[in-house]
Curated annotation (Swiss-Prot):
Chemical reaction(s) catalysed: UDP-N-acetyl-alpha-D-muramate + NADP(+) = UDP-N-acetyl-3-O-(1-carboxyvinyl)-alpha-D-glucosamine + NADPH + H(+)
Enzyme Commission (EC) number: 1.3.1.98
Active-site residues annotated for this sequence: 175, 252 (proton donor), 355
Subcellular location per the Swiss-Prot or TrEMBL entry: Cytoplasm
Highest taxon listed in the record's lineage: Bacteria
Coiled coil (residue ranges): none
Pathway: Cell wall biogenesis; peptidoglycan biosynthesis
Function: Cell wall formation.
One record GO biological process: cell division
Protein name per the record: UDP-N-acetylenolpyruvoylglucosamine reductase
Gene Ontology terms: cellular component: cytosol
């Protein structure tokens, strides 16, 4: 475990303490201290020691789903850089793998596809680390990690012990879990049970089915599914590219609103002049509605507010807010997010909620 020296008012902080270098938005202020953990033991030790010093703690891995304020973080940031994957159980039909929290997510997905392990292929191209996936219950193109996670190894900051939390106890819901709702647990590694198959799971997402030229419910070779997802994501600026400011983002900034039936019918009435809102009914009577559609129909199109903006909506996808220059501040991003949220609320009566974790800033 390595440590960047603590910054003080008398000494200019080391460049490694500036958090913009650790986020895909390239935004964020200074941290008091940055510690790098290259193993689960390092991660536990870094969090425990900072806690013993009475410091605030921020655990940061890929930095792809976090917005850090301009004031930075007045405490210790523990960078998760643990790597590794091992098979812990196998049978004729399935394989269970344990993956360290710092393992880059898309490298894991590529590995599973190459080994003909089915279950993660539609989650290709998502930036960030494996340890972040249960926190958000990451999902895309008809798959989410809650379907394949069997358990999560954690450090419990309350008891000071390590433990395994079974999937049934993780509180998985749409883009959320107990790990997002509380900072009590630090994810050390994640177990996934995957099918031993050269074919994808049934294609559930209509856009992906069209890209593959198959019917919803069909299965395709894993590599074909992965390639199609990567193409779709790249077309929306959702695959990291250092040369493309449309990818300097946290991906989808707002979650798709989940409405009860009455709320959905009210939305349909208010949207009657612009068309039927794209929606997906849930099994519990709720309806999930496209946030991208709501944003666009509220007058916030791709590229808003224009090419002169230091932060704008992506030119490829209305759900992504992007950093367009080296001069932007987090407050610029937050101001744009507030404008969009207020506009959607005024137009449709629906409140959008941010998907990323907000640190030292708020909408």
């Amino acid at each position: 475990m390595s440590e960047v020296p603590q910054s003080t008012s008398d000494v200019h902080p080391d460049a490694e303490c500036h958090l913009s270098r650790y986020t895909t938005l390239r935004l964020g202020g200074w941290a008091t201290r940055v510690v790098t953990a290259t193993s689960a033991d390092d991660l536990v030790r870094g969090v425990r020691e900072a806690g013993d010093r009475g410091e605030r703690i921020l655990v940061l891995a890929g930095g792809s789903n976090v917005v850090i304020g301009d004031a930075g973080f007045p405490g210790t940031v523990v960078l998760v850089r643990s790597r590794g994957l091992k098979v812990i159980e196998t049978d004729t039909d399935t394989v269970t793998v344990r993956v360290e929290a710092g393992e880059p997510w898309d490298e894991l997905v590529a590995h599973t596809v190459a080994n003909e392990w089915s279950g993660l292929e539609c989650l290709s191209g998502i930036p960030g680390s494996t340890g972040a996936t249960p926190i958000q219950n990451v999902g895309a193109y008809g798959q989410e990690v809650a379907e394949t996670i069997t358990g999560v190894q954690v450090y419990d900051r309350v008891t000071g012990t390590t433990a395994r939390i079974e999937a049934r106890d993780c509180g998985f819901s749409y883009r959320s879990s107990i790990f997002k709702r509380s900072d009590r647990w630090v994810v050390l590694s994640v177990d996934f049970r995957l099918a031993r198959s050269p074919l994808s799971g049934p294609v559930r997402y209509a856009e992906l089915a069209r890209a593959l030229d198959v019917a919803v419910g069909d299965r395709v070779p894993l590599a074909k599914a992965r390639a199609a997802v990567l193409r779709l994501r790249a077309g929306k600026g959702m695959v990291l590219d250092a040369a493309d400011p449309d990818t300097w983002s946290v991906g989808s900034f707002f979650t798709n609103p989940v409405l009860d039936r009455a709320g959905y019918e009210r939305l349909r009435e208010r949207a009657a002049d612009v068309g039927e809102p794209p929606s997906w009914p849930g099994t519990d009577g709720t309806v999930k509605v496209s946030a991208a559609w709501l944003i666009d129909k509220s007058g916030f199109g791709k590229g808003h507010p224009g090419p002169a903006g230091v932060v704008t909506i992506s030119t490829k996808h209305t759900l992504a807010l992007t950093h367009r220059s080296g001069t932007a501040r987090t407050e610029d991003l937050v101001r744009l997010a507030r404008e969009i949220r207020r506009g959607v609320q005024a137009r449709f009566g629906v409140t959008l909620h941010p998907e990323p974790v907000l640190v030292n800033c708020a909408l």
